[in-house]
């Protein structure tokens, strides 16, 4: 399988990288296969860093993800002018079909895997810088894309349809009843959002970040990206801490954010700075966190209510109501 891909790379090397091609490249499979897809990193002879990323898909589901990601990256490349932003995500190079496979080739984005920066106690002093860098990137991305993304309506509209539950609608009503704007009415935070901002999709560069895996990009609020990132970062840190203390279960999101936990405190401080940059009141921090996690609950469910019993929908309804009560009965 690697021979046709190697031939494709070498034949277009000059075009993509503006230099003469090497005698050969070594294609290394990284990570694990996932639903008929895998990733290759091509290293030229003697090279210390891969020159690009090759994503290969055999099934239609994964092939459609590659096409969608390639289209999203192409759209961003044609619309954005901020060079710092352009340098933070991959450049799409080619989308080719070979022997029943769909192959997407992107430029390589350097940086340190963010989960490794969140996993060790001695890294704790770095985490505020990491959080601020992610927040700054999201604010810049929103500012650069707000004129490109379709605008939301002025009511609950599309947001309500997407939530598929009366509990979130009630949360939106309570937000308005407490004098807080809902995401639908926050035009200052509407633009394109990454859509899947997990820690493993963020690369730490010391003073800036890189962002990869763009197949879920869509119109929306950057606040959703932010709180989804915080929730998964909390789970990453909680899991590492529980592994160090044998027999202790990882803390739930509720424990991290509504009880005293060092990451919850750092996350809330970073959230206040994030909202300041967006010119939003800090009192929106907790409601927006709950709303975002409620919307992503099907992905976060195993961590939301550890030890809970009962039907999924019933438990989630009780949990969301408790979170709403926590939000509006605590100081923001």
What is each model feature region?
Residues 98, 106-124, 143, 293-307:
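A glycine-centered beta->alpha junction motif in the catalytic cores
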Residues 207-257:
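Active-site Asp-x-Gly
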Residues 75-83, 109-152, 182-186:
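Conserved kinase catalytic-core helix
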Residues 17-46:
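ATP-binding glycine-rich phosphate-binding loop
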Residues 5-23, 146-194:
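An alpha-helical support segment within catalytic cores of ATP-dependent transferases
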Residues 278, 293-332:
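ATP/Mg2+ or Mg2+-diphosphate-binding catalytic cores
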């Amino acid at each position: 399988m690697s021979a046709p891909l190697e031939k494709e790379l070498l034949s277009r090397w000059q075009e993509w990288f503006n230099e003469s091609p090497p005698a050969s490249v070594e294609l290394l499979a990284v990570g694990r296969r996932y639903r008929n897809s895998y990733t290759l990193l091509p290293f030229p002879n003697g090279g210390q860093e891969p020159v690009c990323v090759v994503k290969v898909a055999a099934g239609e589901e994964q092939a459609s993800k590659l096409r969608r990601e390639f289209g999203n990256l192409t759209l961003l490349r044609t619309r954005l002018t901020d060079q710092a932003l352009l340098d933070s995500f991959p450049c799409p190079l080619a989308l080719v079909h070979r022997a029943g496979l769909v192959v997407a080739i992107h430029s390589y984005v350097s940086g340190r895997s963010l989960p490794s920066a969140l996993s060790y106690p001695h890294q704790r002093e770095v985490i505020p810088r990491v959080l601020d860098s992610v927040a700054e990137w999201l604010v810049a991305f929103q500012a650069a894309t707000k004129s490109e993304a379709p605008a939301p309506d002025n009511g609950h509209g599309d947001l309500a349809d997407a939530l598929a539950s009366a509990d979130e609608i009630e949360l939106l009503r309570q937000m308005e009843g407490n004098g807080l704007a809902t995401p639908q009415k926050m035009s200052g935070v509407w633009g394109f959002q990454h859509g899947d901002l997990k820690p493993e999709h963020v690369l730490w560069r010391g003073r800036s970040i890189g962002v990869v895996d763009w197949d879920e990009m869509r119109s929306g609020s950057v606040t959703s990206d932010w709180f989804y990132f915080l929730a998964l970062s909390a789970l990453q840190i909680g899991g590492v801490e529980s592994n160090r203390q044998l027999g202790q279960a990882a803390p739930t999101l509720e424990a991290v954010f509504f009880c005293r936990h060092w990451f919850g405190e750092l996350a809330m401080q970073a959230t206040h700075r994030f909202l300041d940059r967006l010119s939003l009141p800090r009192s929106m921090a907790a409601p927006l966190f709950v709303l975002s996690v409620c919307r992503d609950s099907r992905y976060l469910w195993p961590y939301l209510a550890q030890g809970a019993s009962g039907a999924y929908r019933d438990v989630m309804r009780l949990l969301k109501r408790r979170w709403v009560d926590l939000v509006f009965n605590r100081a923001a």
